[in-house]
Amino acid sequence: MEKPEGISEDPEFCSMIDRLRDEVENEEGSLPAAFGELARTTDPEELHDLLTAPGRPLWAREIAAYRLGVAGDPRAFEALVLLLNHRDPERCVTAAHALIRLADPRTARAAAALATNELRAAYALLPVRLLADLRAPESVPALVTVLERRLANGDPHWRVGLACVEGLGTLGDPLARDVLEAALPHPRLGRAAERSLALLAG
């Protein structure tokens, strides 16, 4: 499928379109004409209508939310937060990219809520990474909370813990020192915790 004109400079959009095209073709056997039309749409009102109309497929809502988000339209916020917490990590990556571009002041609070929701711990990786990228006041407290939980014996979500360790090192806040020191004996997190401790300010 030819890339829609005007978006080739956005590799994340191109990657999303390729992924969704394969997904739709695998599920439906062919690509509906509406897919190409939506991929080329830039009108914010048309995109918002697609985002809010009942019965729209997930691929259409994802394209519309992404387009609105990177254009700075706050009407994309709720849809992008839902996609950030999706079980499909590729959708989460795309949503996180759009949320950063959106720069909505609600994003950090929403990401912190998703990251610290223990019932969704398996899907917290992208919210954790987003918090580190945002460098918001909510970032360090949320990452500390999540990492403390991931240090429990037998916890299966060590990749989330690793993202917390790396994020806290990137943020460089000395408030993270205690939890990073607690992570040093962890067999999967210890080396990363050592590196992050070296990055802390103060």
Segments and roles (model prediction):
Residues 34-37, 67, 98-101, 130, ...:
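Core register positions within helices of long alpha-helical scaffolds
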Residues 17-28:
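HEAT-repeat alpha-solenoid elements in large eukaryotic scaffold proteins
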Residues 28-40, 49, 56, 60-70:
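Alpha-helical segment of the N-proximal tetratricopeptide repeat
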Residues 4-18, 39-53, 73-85, 104-117, ...:
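Amphipathic alpha-helical scaffolding segments comprising HEAT/armadillo-like alpha-solenoid repeats
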Residues 31-34, 64, 95, 127, ...:
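Conserved hydrophobic register position within alpha-solenoid helical repeats
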Residues 55-57, 87-88, 119-120, 157, ...:
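Short inter-helical turns and helix N-cap capping residues of alpha-solenoid HEAT/ARM repeat scaffolds
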Residues 28-31, 61, 92, 124, ...:
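Residue-level detector of extended alpha-helical repeat arrays and alpha-solenoid scaffolds
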Residues 157-183:
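Extended alpha-helical scaffolding segments
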